[in-house]
Amino acid sequence: MPHVILLHGLHMHAWAMKPFAVLLKEQGFTVDTFGYYSVWQTLPQHAAALNRFVETGRYGGGPLHFVGHSLGGLVLRHFAAAHPDKVSGRIVTLGTPHCGSMAAERVRSMGLGTPLLGGSYRYALDGAAPSLPSGIELGSIAGSKPQGLGRMLGLHGSQDGTVLVGETRCPGMGGHIVL
C-alpha cells in the first residue's frame, strides 16, 4: 500500500494538512503528517527530525511518497539530499520557492527576517536549498492567483500571493504544473 507523509509550510501546523490527508486516504493511501516549528530551527535540523520520524514509522510494503507545502517542500529537498535512500516514492511540492523567495527577501530587507522567518531563511528561502540527488522524482504545483502578502510586498507577475511561479522550479525537476 502506498504511503504519503505530508509537510506543512511556514508558520503552519501539521493539522493544516489534515483536509489533504483525508482526501488522500479516500484514494487508498496511508497518510501521516509531520509537524515542525518552522522558524525555530534551520531546514537541515528539520530534515534530521523528519528522518527520525520516518525511521520510527512502519512504511514497509510500498513506496514512501512525500508532499510538502511551501517551506515543507524545501525541508524535503534537504531530507532527500541527506537521506536519498528514504525516498522510495516521489516528492510533490505545492507552492514551494525552490530557487529562493522574493517575498522572504523583502521581509528580511525590512529588518523583519529574524522574527518572521527565523531559521527558515538560511539554506532555503535564500535560494540555497541543496540539489536533488540522482534518481529522486520531484514534481511541483504552483498557484497563479494572487492571494496573501504579495501585494503588500510588491510582488509582480504570476504568483500565488507569496511565491512567484518562477520560484517554484528547480533543476532536475520531473514535472511542473501551474494552476
Spans of model-derived segments:
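Serine-dependent carboxylesterase/thioesterase catalytic core
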Residues: V4-L10, W15, P19, L23-S38, ...
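C-terminal catalytic-base region of ester-bond hydrolases, centering on the histidine
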Residues: P133-L179
